[in-house]
Amino acid sequence: MSRPVPNPGILDIAPYTPGKSPVAQPGRKVFKLSANETPFGPSPHAIAAYQSAADHLEDYPEGTSRVLREAIGKTFGLDPDRIICGAGSDEILNLLAHTYLAPGDEAIATTYGFLVYPIATMANGAKLVIAEEKNLTCDVDAILAKVSPNTKLVWLANPNNPTGTYIPFDEVRRLRAGLPEHVVLVLDGAYADYVAKNDYETGIELVSTTENTVVCHTFSKIHGLAALRIGWMFGPANIVDAVNRIRGPFNTSVPAQLAAVAAIKDTAHVEMSRAHTIQWRDRLTEEFTKLGLTVTPSVCNFVLMHFPQTAGKTAAEADAFLTQRGLVLRGLNNYGLPHALRMTIGTDEANELVIAALREFMAQP
């Protein structure tokens, strides 16, 4: 009996594995610290805006997310006509791959880049080429060394998940200058809101002055709208025009659009979340280092800690130990980091519990 056969390369794609969801434990509070979600939830104004959409669920959305694009444009001083909104930035990444990659093409990503990059690349029949990182950080020279006549696109998460590292804007500018003009540079800024470094920029300047660079952002992280799937891209007119030709006409829902507009206007909520993250990022790094763990310097809303390979002290054993205590972190085997755990910065209570639990774990004989 014959059956449908997927396109070449589809079955070579490793399915994306999200962070573990917590399993209820009788008599114990469970904290999900595995998916880099905000511990504060969305702005109350975003919740109210979302609820207001219930009165007209029979109506299709405005097909271009115009009101949201205008709100984003006003917030960041951008031309709304050069903004595309999507069902999460994941959809936009896939749209970019579908627009610019075909069988025989190559896209470049770094060793520990976001796992959606290989999916988007290979789903379009293209080959993903890996540029080695240096100290868990993007290496511009390594990327440029991988460029070939078949290179059509470069994926760069800056800052990066799951490492939490970033490269200064001067390095991003050097990367763009070193790439052929026909290569699209995709700057994924999902975690940009958490960066507090003077030498960091999202890349909007490059987008404004080139025809081959885009910046992607999400409302899933600091704005707390992960459940609604809403993100956006700022790009040159030529790329926006091309992507819009394959974008679904009603790809973002009315509730998501309204909530995102309210979220982006509530700057106090954003600043509160950012301040909490920065304070705890420093504290957790210090505490985990005291325990003998190696912590990769992070500019995001999570920390990456590396465990010994000694029996009784491994990342897998620490993960099990924490899970038993209602603390759900992210193991990173699928990223090629089997000896590390990634912890989302949670509430004060959750963070203190992780510190105490790891102190107990590392003190075991």
Curated annotation (Swiss-Prot):
Q: Does the keyword Amino-acid biosynthesis apply?
A: yes
Which positions carry N6-(pyridoxal phosphate)lysine?
A: K221
Query: What does the record give as cofactor?
Result: pyridoxal 5'-phosphate
Enzyme Commission number: 2.6.1.9
Pfam families reported for this sequence? Aminotran_1_2 (PF00155)
Q: Which UniProt keywords apply?
A: Amino-acid biosynthesis, Aminotransferase, Histidine biosynthesis, Pyridoxal phosphate, Transferase
Q: Which family does it belong to?
A: Belongs to the class-II pyridoxal-phosphate-dependent aminotransferase family. Histidinol-phosphate aminotransferase subfamily.
| PANTHER family tied to this protein | HISTIDINOL-PHOSPHATE AMINOTRANSFERASE, HISTIDINOL-PHOSPHATE AMINOTRANSFERASE 2
What name does this protein carry? Histidinol-phosphate aminotransferase
From which source organism is this entry?
A: Rhodopseudomonas palustris (strain BisA53)
Gene, per the UniProt record: hisC
